[in-house]
Swiss-Prot record:
Catalyzes the attachment of alanine to tRNA(Ala) in a two-step reaction: alanine is first activated by ATP to form Ala-AMP and then transferred to the acceptor end of tRNA(Ala). Also edits incorrectly charged Ser-tRNA(Ala) and Gly-tRNA(Ala) via its editing domain. Consists of three domains; the N-terminal catalytic domain, the editing domain and the C-terminal C-Ala domain. The editing domain removes incorrectly charged amino acids, while the C-Ala domain, along with tRNA(Ala), serves as a bridge to cooperatively bring together the editing and aminoacylation centers thus stimulating deacylation of misacylated tRNAs. It catalyses: tRNA(Ala) + L-alanine + ATP = L-alanyl-tRNA(Ala) + AMP + diphosphate. Signal peptide: none annotated. The keyword Transmembrane does not apply. It comes from the Bacteria. Zn(2+) binds at H567, H571, C669, H673. PROSITE patterns: AA_TRNA_LIGASE_II_ALA. NCBIfam families: alaS. This is Alanine--tRNA ligase. The gene is alaS.
Amino acid sequence: MKQLSSAQVRQMWLDFWATKGHSVEPSVSLVPVNDPTLLWINSGVATLKKYFDGTIIPENPRITNAQKAIRTNDIENVGKTARHHTMFEMLGNFSIGDYFRDEAITWAYELLTSPEWFDFPAEKLYMTYYPDDKDSYNRWIEVGVDPSHLIPIEDNFWEIGAGPSGPDTEIFFDRGEAFDPENIGLRLLAEDIENDRYIEIWNIVLSQFNADPAVPRSEYKELPHKNIDTGAGLERLVAVIQGAKTNFETDLFMPIIREVEKLSGKVYDQDGDNMSFKVIADHIRSLSFAIGDGALPGNEGRGYVLRRLLRRASMHGQKLGINEPFLYKLVPTVGKIMESYYPEVLEKRDFIEKIVKSEEESFARTLHSGQHFAQGIVADLKEKGQSVIAGQDVFKLYDTYGFPVELTEEIAEEAGMTVDREGFEAAMKEQQERARASAVKGGSMGMQNETLQNITVESVFNYNTSQLSSKLVAIVADNAEVGAVSEGTASLIFAETSFYAEMGGQVADYGQILDESGKIVATVTNVQKAPNGQALHTVEVLAPLALNQEYTLAIDSNRRHRVMKNHTATHLLHAALHNILGNHATQAGSLNEVEFLRFDFTHFQAVTAEELRAIEQQVNEKIWEALEVKTVETDIDTAKEMGAMALFGEKYGKEVRVVTIGDYSIELCGGTHVGNTSEIGLFKIVKEEGIGSGTRRILAVTGKEAFEAYREQEDALKAIAATLKAPQVKEVPHKVEGLQEQLRQLQKENAELKEKAAAAAAGDIFKDVKEVNGHRYIASQVSVSDAGALRTFADNWKQKDYSDLLVLVAAIGDKVNVLVASKTKDLHAGNLVKELAPIIDGRGGGKPDMAMAGGSNQAKIQELLDAVAGKL
């Protein structure tokens, strides 16, 4: 077996499949593009769904890739096991309706055992297969596998929901008896027993059926095009090739671990408890790549996952004695390890470090708050004479503040208490079940549409005209190809079309289809890309249409031009965001409609009013400069040399269109644009908002819509000016300032009146002094409008020696508010209010001299007042 670095293993995989006629698909962003079914790209095949379900026919049906992926359903196991990771690389080879079982198995065996490639010892390889899949069993024997190395497994059938499915055959590497202390042998494989001896390195899925949950597996229909979908974990392959005990002792992780050793002063011991080293090494990889791909820490979705990973890694750093932000210092190491195939981490190093460090500092503050919360729980339990911290409280510390259970146990131990571990585990399990139930499943590929897949006629989109004559080359009605159609809805393909198919965030063209006499025979209501790339026109048929006849295609030119203005404005906006917010503010989605444009971008905070003003100003300046908009067609490498901005995660063909706007913007784009920015006229941002963790959205309008938006604002200002009796709009701010000053004066006068009224009322209340056990106290119900008035009473009470203790209760709305104030050390206001609050079904707390509580049971107010004496 060859000794190879991880970079060499990855490259050898890609090189081998290239020799078998496969196209190498580059790894795409971990953040899915145009796929709302996925939180993360979680497998090598996830980026190829559109090929497998037949939505798009690939240029080459043979594909190979090395795809970064994230799975976070078992975060707690990372660091505990030898092979659990949050981020991993999946190596894959795929056939979309081309080769099948025989080639897939033959080539897999060649790649693994040939001296030219990985050169694995054949006797170390074992294969599992689906019992009914005799073809795979026979093929393995034909390529040279000993029958004793073939294990039937009932679970070897891949399906997730509706869509492509089929048997799979898995390849395992036997690491020997040293990893099988009980000498169980092949039963480990046959009975699917968790073990470290037989390591699964590759799974080959033979996708030959269209799964249908409504029928038994035996009734699944054969796919019109059978596919091969395989996955081999790079980390596992590298561990086997490098003879590592676990995946962490490979060159993918050890450089990170060595850096952690330097930062902590601790040493990684392969045979010891190294969980903290492993957690940090794993999690910083996920954080570096995910943030580099535009995901940012937050409180929901992807953001919550990243925040949880960072906090878990940070806590494990503390276990190693690192008590300051340190994870950001590991980003360059991650970048260097992966640089040969993933240069983006080093390219975005400064931004990634900034986000990680900021989040670490924020967590340090949160952790401090959590310690206060934990200490409060301990104090409450001590007062009640209890000694067990409830599982729900332990879970809240874990989930909200990032406290590991061990830290809570330490705090409990110092206080002579214990932790309800069982209750915590139950709360944790409940959360995991909720997460799994709500997790978006992304495995199903959807049903293949055989009719559309089989339409291979050529169709060309003409960018340069709004009307042309073209031959009708395909008609689809009721999901079948037909020769003619006379009514209803149909889908049409023409040899050439002027209609733009919805793509790249630009909506489709609408328009009409006319016959030779000029009669309208159909209206076009939608245009989408067919699997083989043709423009598929959805039409309402008004008169008979026949195959191979010439028709005139006329788009709604006014509608198209309005969309073009918005699309070009989107490019200007993207450039302005880079200039004003920074290069990290990259496109995360867009929609160029008729009446507006919507642009989503990555940014870690709300855009300020000043920034929005600067962005809007810059876009308008470029419009008024009347910059020429040019489009050129070239190859992808030349386009990148020109400096064209490619959207990360998007796939581009060999030929691409480059759209340049003067020397201000240059992007790859297949959409339609105005010829000069002056055609846009005017640009106005109407809304900016957050739509998810680390993602912002701008809604804007151009041209006539922008003018109308400004006019609406002007009309509103004029109406305000009239109300304020301001002669001119520009005087409105001055008038508003005057009103604000009047309001402040009235509020001040109102507060003074309240104080006088409170003082008058206090005169009566403070006379009602009682005494018990040598303590003078006042306990009374008062009528006030808010809790602040209770504090005013207390302030007045403090001015003179009325009593040692003051207890005031007020019914405000449907709630009860309680204030306790004390002037003596032996009467603790905070403790007393905690004892009184449960009477009104409430909770409270505070300082020795002042405390407050809130409750809901107004019927128990008198009972609370009567109870005061018994507490003294």
